[in-house]
């Protein structure tokens, strides 16, 4: 008799598992059966599919009602939407009490707490699941949660970010063909990039992880968060064309999410205003501009003009003053430029602080300064010297708009000399990255 009952339970669980797998497949592969034009309907369609699945599950369950696996699968079905479900929390909490070693129930419960905004409880669930069994889902989720845990100090947050990268790498090692693991590793590297002074090697690792996610998992390309996060990195690296493309794609994939569209518009607005200011040299009148340029003095070079400049290699070097129009793309070692500020431009995101620099009758160059405190800035008429300037040439085309301009990237205001004076350490601050608190 027991054997027959066990067989029945097994059959019921198998059927329930199939129904839940189909529901999640519907969500993950939505854009394989729908066009991007249907993106606005996706959440509603998933919700309707969930209701349908729960109804079918109810018909199958029968007398197996209180079984831990049944509770887990029902909770998982309720957890398919991005919203917090109190019912899912209740069922999954019961499931882990009945069967504390049921790892999938712990993982699902952790996701429920995450959606509820209880990051500490989510962390406990994923860590607890790993004590029962090493599995990629707990590692993925732990990586995600570690970056959002509240901390009392910057050092503690840095440790969490490093740990987040470690957990994501472990998840990738467990299954190199899991796109979600690669995507979460990309996000961990993105946080590390902003947490450790924007090392270009780390941004490359983030971009490689995102590319790998798309390569191994066809559904990764329809993940709006992947496109937004990658675009954030591209924008910071001044790859504006790729950034606009990413924001635009994220907006198309999730029309109800305002951030990608806003970020695309903000960047377009910034580029439009910047190129207009560059063309008009900040609308400074010719006579005024000539007077400003006539006031440029070698003394304004400060430590960049007397052989005391310490290069990145740590050696003291004598810099050669060059006109802006003689700069080559990339870092111009051994050179220094000196010019007058003709405009400044801040964005809603405050980073970078952008200003226009002119040193002759030639064109105006944009200077983009990163990692500065919000109170730092330069004024129109200030003399600014930039040692070993890093020149970028921009050619951007997006939705019928064209932008072309030259810019100098400055990683910290500490590199600048303003009116002959080096900038103090109080002018520098670290950049941060914000992401929406939802399951990755």
UniProtKB/Swiss-Prot annotation:
Source organism per entry reads Bos taurus (Bovine)
GO BP terms in the entry: cellular response to starvation; DNA damage response; DNA repair
Record carries keyword Repeat: yes
Q: Which PROSITE patterns does this UniProt record tie to the protein? A: TPR, TPR_REGION
**At what positions is Phosphoserine found?**
203, 221
Domain of life of the organism encoding this protein = Eukaryota
Q: Where in the cell is it found?
A: Nucleus; Cytoplasm; Cytoplasmic vesicle; Mitochondrion matrix
Where, by residue number, is the motif Nuclear export signal?
13-24
- This chain's protein is named Tetratricopeptide repeat protein 5
Kindly indicate whether the keyword Nucleus belongs to this entry: yes
> Where does each TPR repeat begin and end?
7-61, 68-98, 103-130, 136-174, 179-216, 224-253
Tell what the record comments on domains. The tetratricopep-repeat (TPR) motifs may function as protein interaction domains.
GO annotation, cellular component aspect: cytoplasmic vesicle; cytosol; mitochondrial matrix; mitochondrion; nucleus
Role according to the record: Cofactor involved in the regulation of various cellular mechanisms such as actin regulation, autophagy, chromatin regulation and DNA repair. In physiological conditions, interacts with cofactor JMY in the cytoplasm which prevents JMY's actin nucleation activity and ability to activate the Arp2/3 complex. Acts as a negative regulator of nutrient stress-induced autophagy by inhibiting JMY's interaction with MAP1LC3B, thereby preventing autophagosome formation. Involves in tubulin autoregulation by promoting its degradation in response to excess soluble tubulin.
Task: Print the keywords alphabetically.
Answer: Cytoplasm, Cytoplasmic vesicle, DNA damage, DNA repair, Mitochondrion, Nucleus, Phosphoprotein, Repeat, TPR repeat
């Amino acid at each position: 008799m027991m054997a027959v009952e066990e067989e029945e339970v097994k059959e019921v669980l198998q059927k329930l598992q199939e129904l839940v797998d189909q529901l999640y497949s519907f969500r993950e592969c939505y854009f394989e059966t729908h066009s991007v034009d249907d993106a606005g309907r996706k959440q509603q369609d998933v919700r309707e599919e969930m209701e349908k699945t729960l109804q079918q599950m109810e018909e199958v369950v029968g007398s197996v009602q209180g079984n831990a696996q049944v509770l887990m699968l029902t909770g998982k079905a309720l957890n398919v939407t991005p919203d917090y479900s109190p019912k899912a929390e209740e069922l999954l909490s019961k499931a882990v009490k009945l069967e504390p070693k049921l790892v999938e129930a712990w993982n699902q419960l952790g996701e429920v707490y995450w959606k509820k905004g209880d990051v500490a409880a989510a962390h406990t669930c994923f860590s607890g699941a790993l004590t029962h069994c090493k599995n990629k889902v707990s590692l993925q989720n732990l990586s995600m949660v570690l970056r959002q845990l509240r901390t009392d100090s910057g050092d503690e947050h840095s440790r969490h970010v490093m740990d987040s990268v470690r957990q994501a790498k472990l998840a990738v090692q467990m299954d190199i063909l899991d796109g979600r693991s690669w995507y979460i590793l990309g996000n961990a590297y993105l946080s590390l990039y902003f947490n450790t002074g924007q090392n270009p090697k780390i941004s490359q690792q983030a971009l490689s992880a995102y590319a790998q996610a798309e390569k191994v998992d066809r559904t990764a390309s329809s993940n709006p968060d992947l496109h937004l996060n990658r675009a954030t990195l591209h924008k910071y690296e001044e790859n504006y064309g790729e950034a606009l493309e990413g924001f635009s794609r994220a907006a198309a994939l999730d029309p109800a999410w305002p951030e990608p569209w806003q970020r695309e518009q903000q960047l377009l607005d910034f580029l439009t205003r910047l190129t207009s200011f560059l063309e008009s040299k900040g609308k400074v009148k010719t006579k005024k501009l000539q007077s400003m340029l006539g006031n440029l003095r070698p003394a304004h070079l400060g430590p960049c003009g007397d052989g005391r400049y310490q290069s990145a290699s740590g050696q003291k070097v004598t810099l050669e003053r060059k006109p802006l129009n003689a700069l080559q793309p990339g870092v111009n070692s051994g050179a220094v430029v000196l010019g007058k500020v003709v405009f400044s431009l801040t964005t809603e995101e405050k980073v970078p602080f952008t200003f226009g620099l002119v040193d002759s009758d030639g064109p105006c160059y944009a200077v983009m300064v990163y990692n500065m405190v919000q109170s730092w800035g330069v004024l129109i008429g200030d003399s600014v010297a930039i040692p070993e300037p890093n020149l970028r040439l921009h050619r951007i085309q997006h939705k019928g708009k064209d932008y072309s301009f030259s810019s100098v990237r400055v990683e910290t205001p500490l590199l600048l000399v303003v009116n002959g004076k080096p900038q103090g350490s109080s002018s520098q601050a670290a950049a941060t990255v914000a992401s929406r608190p939802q399951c990755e």
